[in-house]
């Protein structure tokens, strides 16, 4: 189980930025993440939105805030992201 004194490097975790669309749950926020991808044949940039649940320990984020998320271990049946920081508060 021990690594014999050698440092084991951890893989880099995904970091995404998105907007909070719901904060009604305790210690959980729903964040809309935008993914831009170029169409393979036509070259048009397509936008796709994905909603993910993220862990917000201190309940600091509110609806409309721009937040930074980091991928983490599964925290519940649907939570795999955690809040790193609130980049910009909603007006």
UniProtKB/Swiss-Prot annotation:
PROSITE patterns: RIBOSOMAL_S17 (PS00056)
Keyword tags: Ribonucleoprotein, Ribosomal protein, RNA-binding, rRNA-binding
Extent of the signal sequence: none
GO biological process terms held by the UniProt record: translation
Claim: Lipoprotein is one of the keywords in the record: no
CDD domains linked: Ribosomal_uS17
An annotated Gene Ontology molecular function: rRNA binding
Domain of life: Bacteria
Assembly, per entry: Part of the 30S ribosomal subunit.
Function: One of the primary rRNA binding proteins, it binds specifically to the 5'-end of 16S ribosomal RNA.
Protein name per its UniProtKB record: Small ribosomal subunit protein uS17
Organism whose genome encodes this protein: Saccharopolyspora erythraea (strain ATCC 11635 / DSM 40517 / JCM 4748 / NBRC 13426 / NCIMB 8594 / NRRL 2338)
């Amino acid at each position: 189980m021990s690594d014999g004194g050698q440092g084991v490097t951890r893989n880099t975790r995904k970091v995404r930025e998105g907007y909070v669309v719901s904060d009604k749950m305790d210690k959980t926020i729903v964040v809309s993440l935008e993914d831009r991808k170029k169409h393979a044949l036509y070259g048009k940039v397509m936008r796709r939105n994905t909603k993910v649940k993220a862990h917000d320990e201190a309940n600091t984020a509110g609806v409309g805030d721009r937040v930074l998320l980091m991928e983490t271990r599964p925290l519940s049946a649907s939570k795999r992201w955690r809040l790193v920081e609130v980049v910009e508060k909603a007006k």
